[in-house]
Amino acid sequence: MRASMLRLIRSRSSSAAPRPHLLRRAYGSESVPERKVAVLGAAGGIGQPLALLMKLNPLVSQLALYDIAGTPGVAADVGHINTRSEVAGYVGEEQLGQALEGSDVVIIPAGVPRKPGMTRDDLFNINAGIVKSLCTAIAKYCPNAVVNMISNPVNSTVPIAAEIFKKAGTYNEKKLLGVTTLDVVRAKTFYAGKAKVPVEEVNVPVVGGHAGITILPLFSQAVPKANLADEDIKALTKRTQDGGTEVVEAKAGKGSATLSMAYAGALFADACLKGLNGVPDVVECSFVQSSIITELPFFASKVKLGKNGVEEVLELGPMSDYEKQGLEILIPELKASIEKGIKFANQ
């Protein structure tokens, strides 16, 4: 089971990511760099399965699990798994510094999940404060770490983090990345089902933001090509945008998309680790500081990952008329979310 899960994590990375045999060729198992990964919010609905998946990742040598409560149990449980990384649990604000010190990658799934009837403002007001506090600690204890932001609303929490790091004098736009991988995972799954092609062969870039209409899957660039009707493309786009709501409703108020989000977060963290370790041509979609759209200081698109985090923000490429229209529609909403985050951070 362990071997199959490891294969799954590796095989579902971006099509540009190297296969395991290429990874071994790049550096032997005995010379894989030491990498510490910290998960903040590790006892939560996303944090626990994410901790499990990161424990299975052979690129991780130290796994630090932090939360305000419950982490010793999660760490003890995950720590019994016979993989490379050493696991330590940290609980409470007084131990946050220990969890962060020496981290190469910090993953932040901390915060409250979305519940039925919860507005975006409700979610923002709670999670924004949590992110602000955690990023203040990151700036102090591991200012050079690559930060993977999962906490929603990502369209606002990434700008919040950027402002906190700027105030601390530690901001590096190459090392702050909003995790939008779940949108890509969903787009691939839904496209494969409609096009009737093997899902492991599918690649679909998703650009824009990470909420509602700001999520813009570029099915015109999907691989392999399929001649889907316009109605099908519109339906696939809508389902990708509403994927989170679909899960919240299916769980009838008892949860959100925790498992698929943990999977997506593990995929993205794996890509970041490969980039840090010098594996070539690692490309993923991410919400980062960008100049692709003039009005938007942050934007999700394909990025090339490397030893410094984001090595290059890639151009959008050719888009269909439907996608161009979607891009125009999302710009004002995404701009408002970004500005809301910046305003909160500077209050």
Swiss-Prot record:
Principal cellular location given in the protein's record: mitochondrion
InterPro entries membership: L-lactate/malate_DH, Lactate/malate_DH_C, Lactate/malate_DH_N, Lactate_DH/Glyco_Ohase_4_C, Malate_DH_AS, Malate_DH_type1, NAD(P)-bd_dom_sf
Gene3D superfamilies on file: Lactate dehydrogenase/glycoside hydrolase, family 4, C-terminal, NAD(P)-binding Rossmann-like Domain
One example GO MF annotation: L-malate dehydrogenase (NAD+) activity
Recorded GO CC terms: mitochondrial matrix
Organism: Eucalyptus gunnii
Biological-process GO terms, alphabetical: malate metabolic process; tricarboxylic acid cycle
Reaction catalysis annotation: (S)-malate + NAD(+) = oxaloacetate + NADH + H(+)
Protein family membership: Belongs to the LDH/MDH superfamily. MDH type 1 family.
Binding residues annotated for substrate, in chain numbering: 114, 120, 152, 186
Cited Pfam families: Ldh_1_C, Ldh_1_N
Name by which UniProt lists this protein: Malate dehydrogenase, mitochondrial
Keyword presence, Cell division: no
Superkingdom of source: Eukaryota
Record: residues binding NAD(+): 41-47, 67, 127, 150-152, 261
Quaternary structure, from the entry: Homodimer.
Organelle targeting peptide span: 1-27
Residues annotated as catalytic: 210
Entry EC no(s): 1.1.1.37
Compartment(s) of residence: Mitochondrion matrix
Keywords: Mitochondrion, NAD, Oxidoreductase, Transit peptide, Tricarboxylic acid cycle
